[in-house]
Amino acid sequence: MQGQEDGDSILPFAKCSRVVSRFSPCSLPPQNRRPMPQPYGDAFWENLSQRSSSNWMVEQYIPPILRATDCSRPSLHPLEGLPPPEKLWRRKRKKLHLERMQKGPGSIPARVRAVTYHLEDLRRRQGIINELKRAQWGSSDATPELPALEEGFELLSTTKYFDVEEERATYPQKETYSVTPRDQLLWTPWTPVGQQGTYASGQLSSLTYSTATARKNPVYDPQAMELESEE
């Protein structure tokens, strides 16, 4: 008995358990069925019908801002179908940007304004280039002096070149040329006795040209080599 009592104290729920049965709504007893309470009773409808309806034709004042945005009509756009404010603001900003690009400020097309800005930028850059030229070369009218060549050579202007040619034509100078034996073999100068003075300059110029070309482009000639060996 003592062990049984100890067991009962240890496991009280095994002895105190109850059987639970659930009844379907159809099998409920008739006294449990109660009429559903109506939200609007007869008194509500009677008061509604007795209320004066003289102000139904008076239009309710709606601010113009709410009229423009259709905020006064909550049934027009339900809350479930509206996009979030971020998307609405993003679309609005994009639309405004496109309108500005198409129209431009001051009712000027955006392409025309872009072209004018580009031309102004080109004029500004050209002005900077002209200022740098004036700072480097002096005035814009004066032509810049050409730098002198290295090793003491100078560039002759056109007027100086023509002056030198005229002096050579009026005062012919006797030029001496040293002719090597190889040059004599390539070309032997011959002048008649009476026309030595008149053909001297032309023959000497042709002599220098032939010797220069012969030195630049030497041609292998076995007969000339034999003559050089005999000499």
Curated annotation (Swiss-Prot):
Subcellular location per the Swiss-Prot or TrEMBL entry: Nucleus; Cytoplasm
Gene Ontology molecular function, alphabetical: cyclin binding; cyclin-dependent protein serine/threonine kinase inhibitor activity; identical protein binding; protein-containing complex binding
Look up the signal peptide feature and give its range.
Answer: none
Keywords, in A-Z order = Cell cycle, Cytoplasm, Nucleus, Phosphoprotein, Protein kinase inhibitor
**Cellular component GO terms held in the UniProt record:** cytoplasm; nuclear body; nucleus
Swiss-Prot/TrEMBL induction comment: By serum starvation.
Concerning Pfam families, the annotation shows:
INCA1
Please indicate the residue ranges that the annotation assigns to the motif Nuclear localization signal: 90-95
Q: To which protein family does this belong?
A: Belongs to the INCA family.
Oligomeric and partner information: Interacts with CCNA1. Identified in a complex with CCNA1 and CDK2. Interacts with ZNF16; the interaction inhibits INCA1 activity and induces the cell cycle process. Interacts with SPACA9. Interacts with CCNA2, CCNB1 and CCNE1. Interacts with the CCNA1/CDK2 complex. Interacts with ING5, DAZAP2, RNF26, USP15, SPOUT1, DPH7, TRIM26 and RAB5C.
Name of the featured protein? Protein INCA1
Please name the source species: Mus musculus (Mouse)
The major lineage groups are:
Eukaryota, Metazoa, Chordata, Craniata, Vertebrata
